[in-house]
């Protein structure tokens, strides 16, 4: 039961931390959305368990914007997308969780 209680306390602590972080996150998201609203395409880069978040991001661009987007792992991005032309029209989002060993 001690482990279960530790998990419960951890969930409460995570909720409080998120509540403190969200206002600044919202501001950052709105700022980047304003700057990137005219981008022609978006790359979502993720490796390891962050690859799923990259996939989700590219799917949301399809659904919400109807613009070109792709998900790719960092190794492939460095070999392929790194050499794209007109990079000022491609928004690149790198998903890099600090706990990801990849």
Located regions from the model:
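A SIS-like phosphosugar-recognition module
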Residues: 1-102
């Amino acid at each position: 039961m001690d482990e279960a209680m530790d998990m419960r306390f951890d969930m409460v602590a995570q909720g409080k931390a998120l509540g403190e972080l969200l206002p600044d996150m919202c501001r950052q998201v709105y700022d980047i959305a304003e700057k990137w609203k005219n981008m022609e395409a978006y790359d979502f880069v993720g490796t390891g368990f962050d690859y799923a978040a990259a996939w989700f991001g590219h799917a949301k661009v399809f659904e919400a914007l109807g613009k070109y987007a792709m998900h790719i792992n960092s190794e492939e991005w460095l070999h392929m997308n790194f050499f794209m032309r007109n990079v000022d029209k491609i928004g690149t989002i790198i998903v890099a969780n600090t706990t990801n060993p990849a």
